[in-house]
Curated annotation (Swiss-Prot):
Disulfide bonds: none annotated. The keyword DNA repair applies. GO terms for biological process: DNA recombination; DNA repair; SOS response. GO terms for molecular function: ATP binding; ATP hydrolysis activity; ATP-dependent DNA damage sensor activity; damaged DNA binding; single-stranded DNA binding. Belongs to the RecA family. InterPro entries: AAA+_ATPase, DNA_recomb/repair_RecA, DNA_recomb/repair_RecA_CS, P-loop_NTPase, RecA-like_C, RecA-like_N, RecA_ATP-bd, RecA_C_sf. This is Protein RecA. GO terms for cellular component: cytoplasm. It holds the Pfam family RecA.
Length: 340
């Protein structure tokens, strides 16, 4: 047995004796050994997994994904749902906006027969549902789309003339406190999609702020900002997608401030082939010499477009490169988590 394991075992026995001898067994104490490793599930994007530094979204934590309209937030969330399903997990999509495109979700790879979809009547109803889902210990991902659409019950039942300043923020604060109290003992990731608003009267600096007050940014272990940086066109000059930059503005799991560039096509979501090639080149799984690309010391293509064509024609080769790239990414993320 390693020296570190012996020390951990002695500390565990010492802590247990202290708790029992002082009649503290009725209280919940943090099990450091049990919670030392945080389980993560891929976001469905290798580039984003690398930027997060943890390999994906953490279970037992709150995550906020925010940005302006048409920046790819919903697509990122839907790809996460598809990834969780591929890992054998169950997901729930709380569609507070009532704007979920089921056909698009299916094109991304989501099994609609296995996806729970909810339309809460008001914000308090949504938080009650989230709390109940967490307690079942059967739901691994809960997506709330979006914070801005979580209308407080008091506002919904009142008249439109009534002043409700601060009501939304108070509801968010209370709801988040309740779910945070039970979330660490669960295997559920709660992902909130949020929007940016302009702060009136700000002349200098950043004049944008997320909706719902400050509670969500406080309780979130991860915060990701999505920003559209380019519109993608095909050879006929038609718009076919967007390029989005995602910055990890807060990270309590690994190193913060990672950046991922994502290509999102309107008809199918992420362009996984480009992500695999970019990371394969970064990790030297595929080696570039001038304009030539080689794998396992064998030349496979000349030019990047030719490389894409070869990999699309040879799916077995693509899967082999992808598998090795994912292994390299997992090793890197494991090192970053240990270092952090």
């Amino acid at each position: 047995m390693a020296q570190k394991e012996i020390i951990n075992k002695k500390n565990t026995q010492k802590n247990s004796s202290f708790i029992e001898s002082n009649n503290l067994t009725s209280f919940d104490f943090f099990d450091a050994k049990k919670n030392s490793e945080i389980e993560t599930i891929s976001t469905g994007s290798l580039n984003l997994d690398e930027a997060l530094g943890s390999g994906g979204l953490p279970l037992g934590r709150i995550v906020e994904l925010y940005g302006n309209e048409s920046s790819g937030k919903t697509t990122i969330a839907l790809n996460a749902v598809a990834s969780f399903q591929k890992a054998g997990k169950t997901a729930c999509y709380i569609d507070a906006e009532g704007a979920l495109d089921l056909a698009y979700a299916k094109s991304i790879g989501i099994d609609l027969n296995k996806l729970l979809i909810a339309h809460p009547r008001h914000g308090e109803n949504a938080f009650a549902l989230i709390e109940s889902l967490i307690k079942t210990n059967k739901i691994s991902l809960i997506v709330i789309d979006s914070v801005a659409a979580l209308i407080p019950k008091q506002e919904l039942e009142g008249t439109i003339e009534e002043q409700t300043i601060g009501l939304h923020a108070r509801m968010m604060s209370k709801g988040l406190r309740r779910i945070q109290s039970i979330l660490p003992d669960s295997k559920t990731c709660v992902l909130f999609i949020n929007q940016l608003r302009e702060k009136p009267g700000v002349m200098f600096g950043n004049n944008e702020v997320t909706t719902g007050g400050k509670a969500l940014r406080f309780y979130s272990s991860l915060r990701m900002e999505a920003k559209r940086v380019e519109l993608l066109k095909d050879k006929f000059n038609n718009y076919v997608g967007i390029k989005t930059k995602v910055m990890v503005s807060k990270n309590k799991i690994a190193k913060p401030f990672g950046v991922a560039i994502l290509e999102i096509m309107f008809n199918r979501g992420f362009v996984h082939e480009h992500e695999v090639i970019d990371l394969a080149l970064k990790f030297n799984v595929v080696v570039r010499a001038g304009n030539s690309y080689s794998f396992n010391n064998e030349s496979i293509a000349v030019g990047k477009e030719k490389l894409l064509n070869v990999l699309s024609e040879k799916p077995a080769l693509f899967e082999q490169i992808k598998e090795l790239t994912v292994q390299q990414l997992a090793n890197k993320n494991s090192f970053q988590q240990t270092a952090s």
